Regions:
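Structural preference for solvent-exposed beta-strand-turn elements
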Residues: 1-322
């Protein structure tokens, strides 16, 4: 927006209440590119009358969103831009390839250091968005929770390496055949000694609560350490309503699995936690109701149809205000 309009006025970003998500890295990057930032109550105003200028930006903390914002700004800025300590998530690489297709000159794709220079003009292109690795991982783990078989088309196992590694540790088997990842969860029965969420290529924080639902179906004691967002464990209270035995100490959760969950009414408080409650409901005895499905719909298009392809019977109905 700044590259095109030279002026913005936006509300502070919201999103899921999973922990601190400051925007200082974004604002600092824009300031280095010549943007005058003014923060008022509930709003961020920015302007660059002469347009954006290329800059050397070093992120003190690796951030997916800040890297993406700086990339988008950099391809419209005068001169050259160098980003250091960039996030390594596959989504960054895909964004770079998209911008390259539009005519931007970018080097260092897939590394911590990305260099770019503005093209004379960005052109229209047709671009196919790759498969969402977190949605694919959710489907894989949903089948794991019910010990089912699943085929996932057009997924990149390299992007899901950490998720598949945990799947294997639990006893699941998978293979790539004719462009489809085929997985068999019939052998899942082993607890996981320790899983720590980490930036890519580590185990994704977005899969943590979904894994927790799966581990409740596995006999024995498993441990999860959440190193990214401090409020990811708010799902624990809801899983306990279904009979889940989970103990939380700080950023570590101990999951005692093997006891059959019981369907009940639970409440989604954020996107991935909501998906995890659906996964728990699929493995539970009886019917489960997940309130505030709008959280889930933010990240899963038509979740009733998505999980329906796995054999689940899911209906989404409008929630009546209490």
């Amino acid at each position: 927006m700044l590259g095109r309009c030279k002026r913005i006025r936006i509300g502070y970003p919201g999103g899921c209440t999973i922990g601190a998500r400051p925007v200082d890295l974004h604002l600092d990057a824009m300031k280095k590119m010549g943007v005058l930032i003014r923060e008022t109550e509930g709003e961020i105003c920015g302007e660059c009358p002469e347009g954006l200028s290329g800059a050397h930006i070093h992120f003190p903390i690796s951030s997916v969103g800040a890297t993406e914002n700086a990339l988008l700004a950099g391809v419209t800025a005068r001169g050259e831009t160098l980003l250091e300590n960039c996030a390594l998530e596959p989504e960054i690489m895909h964004l770079c390839h998209f911008l390259q297709a539009m005519g931007a000159e970018i080097r260092g794709i897939g590394t911590r250091k990305i260099w770019m220079r503005r093209a004379a003009a960005l052109r229209d292109v047709e671009y196919t968005i790759p498969t969402d690795r977190i949605v694919a991982g959710t489907c894989l783990y949903a089948a794991a929770a019910t010990r089912g078989h699943i085929g996932l088309k057009d997924v990149d196992p390299q992007e899901m390496k950490s998720v598949l590694r945990v799947y294997e540790k639990m006893g699941g088997q998978w293979e790539m055949r004719s462009g489809t990842l085929r997985a068999n969860a019939a052998g899942i029965r082993f607890p996981v000694e320790q899983v720590c969420t980490m930036p890519y290529p580590g185990f994704p924080t977005d899969m943590q609560s979904i894994l927790m639902s799966v581990l409740l179906t596995v006999p024995g004691e498993s441990r999860i350490e959440e190193r990214i967002f401090e409020k990811r464990f708010q799902i624990v209270e809801e899983l306990r309503k279904m009979g889940g035995r989970i103990t939380v100490t700080g950023r570590q959760a101990v999951v005692c699995g093997g006891r059959k969950l019981t369907g009940t009414t639970v409440c989604a408080r954020e996107l991935r936690g909501g998906a995890a409650l659906v996964v728990a409901g699929l493995s539970a005895q009886g019917e489960s109701v997940v309130k505030h499905a709008e959280y889930i719909e933010r990240g899963y298009e038509r979740p009733d149809q998505l999980f329906g392809q796995l054999g689940a019977v899911i209906r989404i109905r409008e929630q009546v205000e209490e």
